[in-house]
Curated annotation (Swiss-Prot):
GO terms for biological process: anaerobic respiration. Heme c 1 binds at residues 79, 93, 96-97. This is Periplasmic nitrate reductase, electron transfer subunit. Electron transfer subunit of the periplasmic nitrate reductase complex NapAB. Receives electrons from the membrane-anchored tetraheme c-type NapC protein and transfers these to NapA subunit, thus allowing electron flow between membrane and periplasm. Essential for periplasmic nitrate reduction with nitrate as the terminal electron acceptor. Residues 1-35 form the signal peptide. Heme c 2 binds at residues 114, 133, 136-137. Gene3D superfamilies: Flavocytochrome C3, Chain A (1.10.1130.10). Binds 2 heme C groups per subunit. It comes from Cupriavidus necator (strain ATCC 17699 / DSM 428 / KCTC 22496 / NCIMB 10442 / H16 / Stanier 337) (Ralstonia eutropha). GO terms for cellular component: periplasmic space. Its main location: periplasm. One of its GO terms (molecular function) is metal ion binding. Component of the periplasmic nitrate reductase NapAB complex composed of NapA and NapB.
Length: 169
């Protein structure tokens, strides 16, 4: 007796379902399945649940100029900026760092490059593309790094290479 098409279709569907169950067991171990889907970047929190917000560390307020680690690195913000208004209507940073106010405030003036447009034309005011300071400049906090860092600045590399221009003797 020859099996009908409906029996063949039913067997194919059963085979697909069994394969899907086997794949689920392989890719989603029992603990992950028990609490829902898990994403490695979120830690143990299931995707459907809201993770606990990370701890906010206090911002340093040292007012010191930090060494820059690479060419063209923007300087860091050495003081607290909590509560500063920085929007299209007002830039609190410019209250102290505008070139016209630095004699009075003793703050470091904004670089002349911040007054240039993308074609290097000098403007009377800060360029709109440089207006939002925290796009490049960030306050610092004394925290443990989330991941390891083995960055070495170019001066250290040059000192290591024997015979290199400027290498230590």
């Amino acid at each position: 007796m020859k099996p009908s098409r409906s029996w063949a279709s039913l067997l194919a569907v059963c085979a697909v379902l069994l394969a899907a169950l086997a794949m689920q067991a392989i890719f989603f171990p029992a603990p992950a399945r028990a609490q829902g889907l898990v994403d490695a970047m979120r830690g143990p929190t299931a995707i459907a649940n809201e993770p606990r917000a990370p701890l906010l560390y206090p911002t340093e307020n040292k007012d010191i100029r930090r060494t820059r680690n690479y060419t063209m690195q923007p300087p860091t913000i050495p003081h607290k900026i909590d509560g500063y208004q920085l929007d299209k209507d007002f830039n609190r940073c410019m209250f102290c760092h505008a070139r016209t106010r630095t004699e009075e405030t003793q703050a470091i003036p904004v670089s002349i490059t911040h007054y240039m447009d993308r074609d290097n034309n000098v403007l009377a005011d800060v360029s709109p593309r440089r207006y939002f300071c925290t796009q490049c400049h960030v306050p610092q906090a004394d925290t443990k790094p989330l991941i390891g860092n083995n960055f070495v600045d170019v001066d250290t590399i040059l000192k290591r290479r024997p015979g290199a221009k400027g290498a230590a003797k």
